[in-house]
């Protein structure tokens, strides 16, 4: 069966999420980037929202952010396995993330973009300056 879902991440997804980060631009050396404990916090901490894109019993991408005291949420990651990039998975994750944020009364989404993620954030109507490494902001008012 070819079932696809975007859902909240669970404890069982932590290793798959961690392995997705084992690629550019997240990788700095030959080691698996980021401590597993940090990925655990993104999944288990109630201040965080982590969604996974699952298809054919495989996690192909995820998006994760953390609620800030200001009422906004900061996106830490939106990553899709290299072999599944440019197949609208990232866009679908962003749309579902925004929908979840609105249901949680989050007032804005903050994100940093570089290279391809910056282009996608532009298409999703985030605001930014024109610097190479760009900070994005999107208010979530109806």
Provide a role label for each language-model segment.
Residues 80, 102, 126-127:
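Beta-rich extracellular carbohydrate-active architectures
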Residues 86-99:
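Conserved acetyl-CoA-binding loop-helix of GNAT-fold acetyltransferases
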